């Protein structure tokens, strides 16, 4: 078990040493050997400015992996793309539609730029979370832009083809542009990920990157894919941006040679997911096992639950209130760690639940 260092790691260095960090979405596993080798080889070579359009082979590999034909532009990361899209397609004071609970930078990209959050809560059913299509229809008239997350962070839902097709119909009826964050797309379990752009190619901007799947968040890079006019609109809000040469080398190695590492990692993540689900069920906590991502969204009996567990269990989790109003009894737990770490964290959480 080779854990990240306490210094130089946001996840492991933010809290005191007696705290187990299961919060920010980093894995504790080292990246694939092929990625490490590609980085070492690139570091011995040219590190100057690359072409603005980036690595051509990498562009083709990304499109092939998603099964899409689209314009593609590199950017410093998916969150940058969210901010740029909000700036490109809305004006201050206007509303931006999204599903809640939602990854906090979605809300920040809207509020930081003086737009209004139009929150459409996911429906919780006995089978898990579902899109509230009726709610989406009611709110769609008030905006031009929908920010979508698929697979969904924090619930781990991988939306099905029927839901995606229905969302596409609503977008067409209401003249919506949809920005779909599909950063976790390869991290699915039983249910495969299907890009929203398969159903709405003319109105979808897809955001992707290697950071979550291959544990490369410290090498920030992403890409926006979609119709050329929409991609060009986003690029106007990414002035003077060049893709990172080391990040491109890592991403290309991941797509070409990272398959065996990803398969083994998904096996461990699936086992961890099932362990957390069994634990939550045995304790009577509200939880639906994620269909994708390595994140567990858990409802507890406690207000300000993350603060409670940090104090009582010395386990750092993401606070539910960061993902939207009304979720302070929830926590997001990152289970992308070694079984020994996860078991110790669950043991500590058990003590706080008694």
UniProtKB/Swiss-Prot annotation:
- Could you tell me which residues carry N6-(pyridoxal phosphate)lysine? 212
Gene Ontology process terms (BP): amino acid biosynthetic process
At the top level of its lineage, which domain of life is listed? Answer: Bacteria
User: Which Pfam families did the record assign?
Assistant: Aminotran_1_2 (PF00155)
Q: Which InterPro entries match?
A: Aminotransferase_I/II_large (IPR004839), Class-II_PLP-Dep_Aminotrans (IPR051798), PyrdxlP-dep_Trfase (IPR015424), PyrdxlP-dep_Trfase_major (IPR015421), PyrdxlP-dep_Trfase_small (IPR015422)
**Classification via SUPFAM superfamilies:** PLP-dependent transferases
Does Amino-acid biosynthesis appear among the keywords? Answer: yes
User: How might one describe the regulation of this protein's activity?
Assistant: Activity increases by approximately two-fold in the presence of GCBP.
**What reaction does this enzyme carry out catalytically?**
L,L-cystathionine + H2O = L-homocysteine + pyruvate + NH4(+); an S-substituted L-cysteine + H2O = a thiol + pyruvate + NH4(+)
Give the PANTHER family listed for this entry: PROTEIN MALY (PTHR43525:SF1)
Q: Give the family per the record.
A: Belongs to the class-II pyridoxal-phosphate-dependent aminotransferase family. MalY/PatB cystathionine beta-lyase subfamily.
What does the annotation say about its assembly with partners? Answer: Interacts with GCBP (TTHA1554).
Supply the name of the protein: Cystathionine beta-lyase
Q: Which organism is it from?
A: Thermus thermophilus (strain ATCC 27634 / DSM 579 / HB8)
């Amino acid at each position: 078990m080779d854990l990240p260092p306490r210094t130089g790691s946001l996840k492991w260095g933010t809290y005191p040493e007696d705290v187990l960090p299961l919060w920010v979405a980093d894995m504790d596993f080292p990246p694939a050997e092929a990625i490490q080798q590609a980085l070492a080889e690139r570091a011995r070579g040219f590190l100057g400015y690359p072409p603005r359009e980036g690595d051509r082979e990498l562009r083709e590999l990304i499109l092939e992996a998603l099964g899409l034909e689209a314009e593609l532009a590199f950017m410093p990361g998916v969150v940058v793309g969210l901010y740029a899209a909000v700036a490109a397609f809305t004006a201050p004071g206007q509303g931006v539609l999204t599903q809640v609970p939602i990854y906090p930078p979605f809300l920040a990209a809207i509020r930081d730029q003086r737009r209004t959050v139009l929150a459409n809560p996911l429906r919780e059913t006995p089978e898990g979370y579902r899109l509230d299509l009726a709610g989406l229809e009611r709110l769609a008239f008030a905006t031009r832009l929908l920010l979508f997350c698929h697979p969904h962070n924090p619930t781990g839902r991988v939306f099905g083809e029927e839901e995606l097709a229905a969302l596409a119909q609503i977008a067409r009826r209401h003249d919506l542009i949809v920005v779909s964050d599909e950063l976790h797309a390869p991290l699915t379990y039983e249910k495969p990920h299907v890009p929203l752009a398969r159903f709405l190619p003319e109105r979808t901007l897809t955001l992707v990157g290697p950071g979550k799947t291959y544990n490369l968040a410290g090498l920030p890079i992403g890409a926006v894919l979609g119709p050329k006019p929409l991609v060009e609109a986003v690029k106007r809000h990414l002035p003077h941006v060049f893709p990172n040469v080391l990040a491109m080398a890592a991403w290309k190695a991941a797509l070409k040679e990272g398959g065996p590492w990803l398969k083994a990692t998904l096996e461990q993540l699936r086992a961890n997911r099932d362990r957390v689900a069994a634990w939550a069920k045995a304790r009577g906590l509200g939880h639906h096992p994620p269909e994708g991502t390595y994140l567990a969204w858990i409802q507890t009996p406690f207000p300000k639950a993350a603060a409670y567990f940090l104090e009582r269990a010395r386990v750092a989790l993401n606070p539910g209130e960061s993902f939207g109003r009304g979720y302070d009894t929830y926590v997001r737990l990152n289970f992308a760690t070694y079984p020994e770490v996860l078991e110790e964290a669950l043991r500590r959480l058990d003590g706080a639940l008694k």
